[in-house]
Amino acid sequence: MRKVIGIGETVLDIIFKDNKPVNAVPGGSALNAIVSLSRAGISADFIGEVGHDRVGSHILDFLKDNHVGVSKMEISPEGQSHLSLAFLDEENNADYL
């Protein structure tokens, strides 16, 4: 069986609506694509980096919960996982910081 491998950045998107945080979800373009493929039943792995912190653990758990292989993920003991702030407008379009 063939497997799709995604390579990219990992971030935790903190979602704001009316300037208040309402959700936090793992993201990054390649990560989102790989999770979508895995949810569609396609075997998938992801290669990226997270920090050795709570955010990194949350991202790894999210990938595992979505049946994405994480054996090649780099866990940086010195680095911190990346965060992104996404502010939604009235039509739920995001403006990222």
Annotate the PLM regions.
Residues 10, 29-30, 50-53:
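Gly/Ser/Thr-rich beta-alpha loop segments that engage phosphate groups in nucleotides
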Residues 1, 22-26, 47-50:
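Short acidic/polar alpha-helix capping motifs at helix-coil junctions
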Residues 43, 47-97:
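Conserved N-terminal subdomain of the carbohydrate kinase-like
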Residues 20-36:
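Short catalytic helix/loop segments, enriched in acidic residues and glycine
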Residues 4, 30-34, 56, 82:
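A general structural signal for well-ordered alpha-helical segments in protein cores
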Residues 1-21:
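Positively charged, low-complexity intrinsically disordered leader regions
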Residues 19-22, 60-62:
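Short, glycine/charged-enriched secondary-structure capping and boundary segments
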Residues 10-13, 33-40:
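Beta-barrel outer-membrane channel/assembly domains of diderm bacteria
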